[in-house]
C-alpha cells in the first residue's frame, strides 16, 4: 500500500467545458495528434455540448476524465511486462516506456479507458498526475490551469488534507466503484 495516495476531486458544477485541462495536458506531454491523456464528456449525452431542458431553463454538466490512479489498478495487475506501475511513495500509476511493448492489455483492462496507445512510439501512455510538476511542489497542470477551479488535488488518504475534507463535505463519489479498483478521482 502506498504511503500517500494522490488523487483529485472534480467539482462538475464548476466545469465550463472549455477543455483547457485536455489541451494543456496534451501540449505538456507532447502527445501526438489524436492521443489524449484526458477527455471531457457531457453528462447524459453521447455528443458533447448538448443541453438539457428548453430555453430559458437549460443546463449542461461536463465531466472531465483522467486516469483514476486506483489503489488497485487493473492496468497494473494485467500488464504482462510490468511496464505499468504504481509508485509506492504517492500512489501515482504510470507507464515505463522502456519496458512497455505496446500490446494494449492495459487499455483493455482499465474500466475507465485511461491508458491510450501511442501508435508512433508503440507504447501505452496515460495521465501521470503531472508527477514531475508535483515533485517540484507544483500542482498538476489541469488543476492550476482550470479557469473554473473545478479540480482539487492532494493526498486523498490523509483525512486532514484539504482534498479529503472536501470529498467528505461534498459527498463526492468515484466513478464505477463496483469495479473494485478503488479509484482516487472523485466527482461531485
Located regions from the model:
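Non-ligating segments of multi-cofactor redox enzymes
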Residues: 1-188
Amino acid at each position: 500500500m502506498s504511503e500517500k495516495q494522490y488523487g483529485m476531486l472534480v467539482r462538475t458544477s464548476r466545469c465550463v467545458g472549455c477543455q483547457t485541462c485536455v489541451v494543456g495536458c496534451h501540449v505538456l506531454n507532447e502527445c501526438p495528434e489524436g492521443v489524449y491523456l484526458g477527455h471531457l464528456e457531457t453528462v447524459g449525452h453521447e455528443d458533447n455540448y448538448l443541453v438539457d431542458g428548453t430555453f430559458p431553463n437549460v443546463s449542461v454538466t461536463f465531466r472531465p476524465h483522467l486516469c483514476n490512479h486506483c489503489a488497485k489498478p487493473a492496468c497494473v495487475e494485467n500488464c504482462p511486462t510490468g511496464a505499468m506501475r504504481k509508485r509506492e511513495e504517492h500512489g501515482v500509476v504510470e507507464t515505463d516506456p522502456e519496458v512497455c511493448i505496446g500490446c494494449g492489455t492495459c487499455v483493455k483492462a482499465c474500466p475507465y479507458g485511461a491508458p491510450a496507445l501511442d501508435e508512433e512510439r508503440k507504447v501505452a501512455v496515460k495521465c501521470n498526475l503531472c508527477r514531475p510538476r508535483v515533485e517540484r511542489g507544483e500542482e498538476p497542470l489541469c488543476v492550476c490551469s482550470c479557469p473554473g477551479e473545478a479540480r482539487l488535488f492532494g493526498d486523498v488518504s490523509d483525512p486532514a488534507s484539504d482534498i479529503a475534507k472536501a470529498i467528505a463535505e461534498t459527498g463526492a463519489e468515484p466513478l464505477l466503484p463496483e469495479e473494485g479498483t478503488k479509484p482516487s478521482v472523485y466527482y461531485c
